[in-house]
């Protein structure tokens, strides 16, 4: 196994991530000693995982979604560390993280692309194209993973020729286009380091989504927030939440408004908001 990992790390250029599903044991157990090989040849590669190191954490399911709130910080340096007292504690921490955690271990959601109709297939099989997830399901995954401060990994299935099947490729293209259609052009946007930010629209118009992003180089400072819309001259709350981090996609009932206001109601330091934007998304 060590030779295989060395080949992978030396013959295929820079690797973004190497992921041992279920974990890579180490010489203290019965497993191969792979982490030093990755460290030597791919020092910038994300590693997942053994009992000493996990650069991110699994979000607790293979549905392509994570729970909410979802914090990037964690009480231990890796998600399967012996410091975590029980399996029950571990499962809860995998799903939500710990806002007071000292370590940066962000969540990862995963799902196979061919997971519809109860299939959940990680590897290619013939005549399986009807189990490619529909676009609506994939968008739901996106909003409940990336939109909840996690990353999203989709399992793709190369065919026996080493190629991605045309149906899979087409669905991925449609997915990218739909993400861009929904969130590529905001009605209005702003940023700032303050407790409150306001978006003023040119005229009254419907809004049903907002995106908030923190400058995560400063950590996750926001603990609670609310978004209000100005309706007939008065502010009314349209949604509220807790974790923001890299990205929070907030979906709420469409409201006709002239302005939106983000108020951070609880934080551990002055909020560093890198992006606050509003959208009117027509859902297909």
Residue ranges and their predicted role:
Residues 1-232, 237-252, 263-280:
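Mature catalytic domains of secreted/periplasmic carbohydrate-active enzymes
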